[in-house]
Amino acid sequence: MRVVVTGASGNVGTSLLKALAGDPAVSSVVGLARRRPELELAKTTWATADVAGDDLGGHFRGADVVVHLAWLIQPSHDPFAMWRTNVVGTERVLAAAAQAGVGALVCASSVGAYSPGP
């Protein structure tokens, strides 16, 4: 099984990559992040992309599963950036996965999904 993980360099993403590296059912993992981390893991190759603006189709083509973990959680710092990543980014991930024919998509989100604000 080929898995693509968006937001792969975050806390949840790196924990998931470590688990996937030890899963015999997983043949390869693409860790997608805005910046490539130093972390090296078995079965994992890194790719850089911003889910809210970059082309995702090439990264998703041939994937069996996309796990979407790219989100921002601090609305007080930059609400527009949080909206762009959390809303626009998720819309783009869903569209790209559908267009690439990905069979399964797992989506987790942040507290930002509950519309935090003043």
Predicted segments, located by residue:
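Residues at the starts of beta-strands that form the adenosine-phosphate
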Residues: 2, 27-28, 103-104
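Short loop/turn motifs at secondary-structure junctions
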Residues: 25, 62, 101-102
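SDR active-site strand-loop-helix element
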Residues: 6, 32, 66-70, 105-111
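Conserved Rossmann-fold NAD(P)-dependent oxidoreductase catalytic core, especially the SDR/UDP-sugar
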Residues: 88, 92-118
